[in-house]
Design a protein with these regions (language model features):
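Short beta-strand/loop segment at the start of cytosolic alpha/beta domains
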Residues: 1-16
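Amphipathic alpha-helical interaction surfaces in cytosolic regulatory modules
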Residues: 23-97
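Short acidic-hydrophobic, aromatic-tinged amphipathic segments that line or gate anion-handling sites
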Residues: 99-101
Length: 101
């Protein structure tokens, strides 16, 4: 299960995720995120309460990054990663694709 909190302010989209971003929750998250991409000039995603991410979740993040890049916007920023998820980002090369803090 994934809980998503979103806040848009002056084109800056902030998203807080709680739970698991997996094969079951990724399509719903993508559907929530997609319409906001047109308005956003920056995206920050807070992983503080995210316990797990699958390859399907990584794909959603990659699509968001590509959409932002295509319109010349800022790189997607991911904050508060736990050690396990940071390791997944390192192994998959996502640490070079997204901005991690």
């Amino acid at each position: 299960m994934l809980n998503v909190e979103k806040k848009m302010e002056n084109g800056a989209l902030f998203i807080a995720l709680e739970g698991e971003l997996d094969t079951l929750s990724s399509p719903d998250f993508e559907a929530e995120l997609e319409p906001l991409l047109a308005e956003a000039n920056s995206i920050t995603i807070d992983f503080e309460k995210l316990g797990y991410i699958s390859s399907a979740g990584l794909r959603v993040l990659l699509a968001a990054e590509q959409a932002m890049e295509e319109k010349g916007a800022e790189q997607v920023k991911v904050i508060h990663l736990n050690d396990t998820i940071r390791n997944i980002f390192s192994i998959t090369g996502f640490e070079d694709i997204l901005s991690l803090e």
